[in-house]
Amino acid sequence: MSEERGMKEQTISEMAQEMAHTTSEGLKKRIRKLYTFDELPAWQKDNELILSGYVRETNSVKECLRAMTYFNNESINIYTHLIPGVAYLVLFLIFADLVLAQLLPGLDAGEHRMLRFYLLGAFTCLACSSCFHCLKQHSEPHSRLWSKVDYLGILAQITCSTISLLYYGYHSYPSHFVFFSTLTVALCSACAVLVLNDSFNTVAFRPLRAFLFMAFGLSGVIPVLAGSYQFGFAEWAARIQLKYVLYEAVFYITGALVYGFRIPERFAPGKFDMVGHSHQIFHLLVVLGTLCHFRAVTGSYIFICTGKHYSSLLMFI
């Protein structure tokens, strides 16, 4: 009887020790959420100049989403595009009808469509980017998939930006608008074919990716020069709000160069792991670029519909 009781006590003790060990290991896993570059699987190693702060392969959408609740080297990348993306979605839903229509009731409501078109493009770009940075650590297949989605979002943003501004710039010349819009869509399609190629999404093609998107963005220079020749510089600058378009270009080009050359972590590996590395700077500059274009396309819309700048209104936009 006592022997049987002793065996039961031993069994209970072993079970308790096993449960304690399991709990301890689970606690360690929960505490140890971040990893160094050297601890990552090969497919996750993208930027060897960022040495720590990584979320390791999760194989779980739930764990990827949970990573949004603690600070890691992707947190700023996620939220710098998630928050503005939600803001653009709200603007897409209410800006034209509840803001412009109230402040300037005489404007043609039908002309809102290209303004909405741009806001939808900005939302799509930022939403795709946020999803990529949130879900990229799931697994290699998911990372490749969401990387393509991210790049397609960028192409959508560039396309919507160019077409929306061309619409107001060539408002009274539909044939010009159709020609340059068709050219923009053709270039976008060519870039999309490359983006969907798996080889294009490897680390070796990082500089080429930056150059490609920068070149596609700069293709908008062609209709800008043509418009300046056709309308004269002063009128064309007013039609497309050229000053803000130039600001936008500066932000995008600077962001692409920072991303492509991995500045500043190139000069101090490990010092900018959590805050201040190139991809975070790139994200912030992209957001600033989208704001400049929003300002430009809104001003262009008002100018075309009224022939006036309404600077007192636009200073708040």
UniProtKB/Swiss-Prot annotation:
UniProt entry keywords in alphabetical sequence: Endoplasmic reticulum, Glycoprotein, Membrane, Transmembrane, Transmembrane helix
Localization annotation: Endoplasmic reticulum membrane
One GO location term (cellular component): endoplasmic reticulum membrane
Residue intervals passing through the bilayer: 81-101, 114-136, 149-169, 176-196, 211-231, 244-264, 284-304
Main subcellular location: endoplasmic reticulum
GO molecular function: signaling receptor activity
Lumenal side: 1-80, 137-148, 197-210, 265-283
GO process annotations (BP): intracellular zinc ion homeostasis
Residues annotated as glycosylated: 73, 197
Membrane topology note: Multi-pass membrane protein
Membrane topology, Cytoplasmic segments: 102-113, 170-175, 232-243, 305-317
Pfam families per record: HlyIII
PANTHER family (alphabetical): ADIPOR-LIKE RECEPTOR IZH1, ADIPOR/PROGESTIN RECEPTOR-RELATED
Family recorded in the similarity comment: Belongs to the ADIPOR family.
Protein's job: ADIPOR-like receptor involved in zinc metabolism either by altering membrane sterol content or by directly altering cellular zinc levels.
Protein name as it appears in the record: ADIPOR-like receptor IZH1
Organism expressing this protein natively: Eremothecium gossypii (strain ATCC 10895 / CBS 109.51 / FGSC 9923 / NRRL Y-1056)
Gene from which this protein is expressed: IZH1
